[in-house]
Curated annotation (Swiss-Prot):
Protein name: Histone H4
Species the sequence originates in: Ascaris suum (Pig roundworm)
Subcellular location: Nucleus; Chromosome
DNA-binding positions: 17-21
Highest classification ranks of the organism: Eukaryota, Metazoa, Ecdysozoa, Nematoda, Chromadorea
Region (Disordered): 1-20
Residues that bear N6-methyllysine: 21
């Protein structure tokens, strides 16, 4: 046994961490057309120009809450990979039950 724990099957060398790009302003990746498409799916005909930034901020808060809960479930199970079921349970915890992803 190489002392890698239960997940390590010799994948990679386990050396120094690579430099990661600093993540900021990723919320701008939710583009104006993407927000427009979501609104169209919801039945909206015309969209005010102020909606886009507001939508991004609301979406960011929502995702932060869901991801925080999902990571909590993942850590409790002593896993490092967030599964679809973690997200389903996180949404259920917030009162937004999601069907179709197991469980």
């Amino acid at each position: 046994m190489s002392g890698r724990g239960k997940g390590g099957k010799g994948l990679g060398k386990g050396g120094a961490k690579r430099h990661r790009k600093v993540l900021r302003d990723n919320i701008q990746g939710i583009t104006k057309p993407a927000i427009r498409r979501l609104a169209r799916r919801g039945g909206v005909k015309r969209i005010s120009g102020l909606i886009y930034e507001e939508t991004r901020s609301v979406l960011k808060v929502f995702l932060e809450n869901v991801i925080r809960d999902a990571v909590t479930y993942c850590e409790h199970a002593k896993r490092k990979t967030v599964t679809a079921m973690d997200v389903v349970y996180a949404l259920k915890h917030q009162g937004r039950t999601l069907y179709g992803f197991g469980g």
